[in-house]
């Protein structure tokens, strides 16, 4: 049996809530696009053998030339178009993983990561990897600090969930 762990990095979002002309995954932080930091973490991780980058159709060439090639992300095996919604892009990434697997790869874990979240680390990958092996699934999350309200169909607050029971998925 051969294990092959793949990271699907989602970078097809339009960032409409930001009202920016530049998609947030391409905004620069300290001279590098936000997407660079996520790809670098997966590139440098010994846990990951393959990266599938899912982006908008209009950004494929940019991602290939200005990010993957420019920064030497050799583990990126495919840059593919995403779908209309996030779940469509995840599905496209999963299909690409299946299509890209060598015959000898019979096991492995698929990491799905939002490319606009640059703070992923080797520690997070290792903990998710261990939990995925143990429980067959894992999601990185942080405890919520804000007060959250559950509203009725008219928008009126009905209940307040306990903060210690609410997590923000990363």
Segment roles from a protein language model:
Residues 2-61:
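N-terminal glycine-rich phosphate-binding loop and ensuing alpha1 helix
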Residues 9, 35, 93, 114, ...:
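Residue-level signal for inorganic ion chemistry
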Residues 16, 115-119:
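Acidic metal-phosphate-binding loop of nucleotide-sugar-dependent transferases
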Residues 48-52, 77, 136:
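Short active-site oxyanion
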Residues 61-67:
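Acidic helix N-cap motif at the loop->helix transition within catalytic regions
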Residues 69-107:
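Short phosphate-binding loop-to-helix
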Residues 106, 119-170:
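Conserved core of the sugar-phosphate nucleotidyltransferase
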Residues 109-113:
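Short aromatic-hydrophobic micro-motifs that form the base-stacking/packing surface
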């Amino acid at each position: 049996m051969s294990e092959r762990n793949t990271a699907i990095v989602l970078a097809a979002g339009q960032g409409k809530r930001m009202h920016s002309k530049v998609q947030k995954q391409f905004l620069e932080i300290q001279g590098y696009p936000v997407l660079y930091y996520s790809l670098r973490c997966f590139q440098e991780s010994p846990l990951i053998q393959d990266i599938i980058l899912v982006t908008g159709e209009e950004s494929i060439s940019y991602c290939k030339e200005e990010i993957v090639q420019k920064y030497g992300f050799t583990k990126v095996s495919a840059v593919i178009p995403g779908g209309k919604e996030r779940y469509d892009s995840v599905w496209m990434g999963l299909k690409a993983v299946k299509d890209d697997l060598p015959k000898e790869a019979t096991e492995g874990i698929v990491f799905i990561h939002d490319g606009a979240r640059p703070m992923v680390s080797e520690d997070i990958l290792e903990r998710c990897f261990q939990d995925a092996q143990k429980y067959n699934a894992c999601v990185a999350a942080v405890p919520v600090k804000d007060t959250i309200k559950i509203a009725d169909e008219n928008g009126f607050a009905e209940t307040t969930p306990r903060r210690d029971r609410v997590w923000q998925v990363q």
